[in-house]
Regions:
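Hydrophobic transmembrane alpha-helices and immediately adjacent juxtamembrane helices
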Residues: 2-299
Length: 299
């Protein structure tokens, strides 16, 4: 038997099934469903409800990236290893950069792995909407899943690189101290800052395609704006306050300090990085969800 619900009944029905939605009856049978709180407006509950879809997209992206290649998943390790050999040859032997007591190959491989994670997360997240325009125009799902997929794919690559990093630490006899307890916080901060930057660029690149043209150049320059291939001791002391205003510099140096026992970043720079992280992530989510309704038409 078919039952036709009146607007009042439908409102009551929907109100009980969606804790993150508010039902507003505007009269004449028109019912508007809106998020009932700020978290709902950011789209986070919808992403959690569709976490199985996020897992599917992540696995599909990883397979699609590496399976068609000859080396397959070996590229996850070979790419940072190849760059590491180049920088060790240039900075270690030609320039003579010293990172004592940390062996230079371990120093560079950790820095390159972190840089590739940062660069990959920002670039992939920024271009995720444009690259997935086809499926987004045909099927509805929480759009935030698209940039989150880019984040988690790069997280998986970074975790694979850390297997090599741990191996190098064992080979060279480098062991972390008590400050390793801060490692997850610095690494999580790096991931969230990278995602926030990519999310902001993704929201604005739909209307401003010049962003995607300039982004590869900016990412190549950023490797020298962070302590990835050179020690922090090479930065002139009078420029250190300006240098640490870059949140990526303090986060990467914090990872080096917590894992390898290098010089700790100033705590004021860590605090400023945390503030910028919160502001950037919130703004990125707001900008993304604000344009979510119209982004498909603009792609």
């Amino acid at each position: 038997m078919n039952t036709k619900l009146h607007p009042e009944d439908r409102a009551g029905h929907f109100r009980s099934t969606s804790p993150c939605s508010a039902i507003i009856d505007e009269g004449e049978g028109v019912i508007v469903i809106k998020p009932s709180n700020k978290i709902g407006r950011l789209g986070l509950p919808q992403v959690w409800e569709s976490k199985h879809l996020l897992k599917y997209f992540v696995l599909r992206s990883i397979r699609g990236r590496y399976r068609p290649t000859t080396m397959g998943y070996g590229w996850i390790i070979f790419r940072p290893l190849l760059l590491c050999l180049v920088y060790v040859g240039v900075f270690g032997y030609m320039v003579g950069v010293k990172t004592d007591p940390i062996p230079f190959p371990l120093f560079v491989f950790l820095g390159i792995s972190l840089y590739l994670f940062f660069s990959g997360t920002v670039s992939d997240t920024a271009s995720s909407l444009i690259n997935n325009a086809g499926i987004m125009s045909k099927v509805y799902y929480p759009r935030l899943i698209v940039p989150l997929t880019s984040l988690f794919v790069n997280v998986m690559d970074l975790l694979a690189s850390f297997v090599v990093i741990i191996g190098l630490m064992l080979i060279y006899g480098v062991y972390p101290g008590w400050n390793v307890v801060y490692f997850p916080f610095f690494l999580g901060g790096l991931a969230l800052v990278s995602f926030a930057m990519g999310l902001i660029l993704a929201a604005h690149s739909i209307e401003r395609r010049d962003i995607m043209m300039a982004l590869p150049v900016v990412m190549r320059v950023m490797v020298y704006a962070m302590p990835c291939v050179y020690p922090i001791s090479m930065v002139p002391e009078k420029l250190l306050p300006l240098y640490y205003m870059n949140p990526m510099a303090s986060l990467i140096q914090g990872i080096r300090w917590s894992l390898l026992g290098e010089v700790a970043p100033p705590w004021w720079s860590v605090g400023s990085a945390a503030v910028l992280l919160i502001i950037g992530l919130y703004y990125g989510l707001i900008a993304f969800t604000r344009d979510e309704r119209t982004m498909v038409d603009s792609l």
